[in-house]
Amino acid sequence: PKLALFEERVKEFNVPTLNERSNSPVDYCKLYRERYMPQKEKSLALGAKVTYLIPPTGKYAALGKNALVDGLFGGATFVDSWIGWEGTDGAFVIDLGEAKEIHSVETDFLHQIGAWILFPLKVVYSYAEDGEHYTHWRTIDLPEERTGEVKFRGVKAESAEPIKTRYVKVEVTGTKECPTWHYGVGHPSWFFIDEVIIK
């Protein structure tokens, strides 16, 4: 009710943006509903063990133990619930603890161009029951994003038939450097993930 009232009022008074990131109030309300309201179906990855094959950068390595599987989405600032990699690719394995039937895996990314945080180029998902012999699930190429707005993007692999597995591997190809159109051209760029959702 409060969110609906807030949305109604900002429309009534023609509030164009909420902050310096140029997100409209309508976008804010939509994001809030999608990211922060309780969801009916819980992720199978909640509380799972995460093993990094390519560890996060700096302080994010220590934060990375639980952040990707704590059920909490990060906000528009990259200091809360986000794990980052700078100038490199990233890779990790989610251990569900036992073999389970899954239908989808989704990784949530942040785009904040002013902080040199860009969406990655590609995400590859694979799975294994034994943690050694992985079967490729899906490779997803992401379109380049140049907007100055803060954005979130879920990158999802789905299967119509259930897949029985214990381990899910996520491999991310980052941009590694700021591209030619970015004012940080040639300098290391980041990508950030806040949550992995498995259902």
Describe each region flagged by the PLM.
Residues 2, 17, 26, 39, ...:
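Generic low-complexity segments that are intrinsically disordered, proline-rich and/or Lys/Arg-biased
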Residues 14-18, 47, 71, 161:
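Glycine-centered secondary-structure boundary/capping sites
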Residues 44, 58-62, 87, 144-153:
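Short, surface-exposed linear segments at secondary-structure transitions and domain or protein termini
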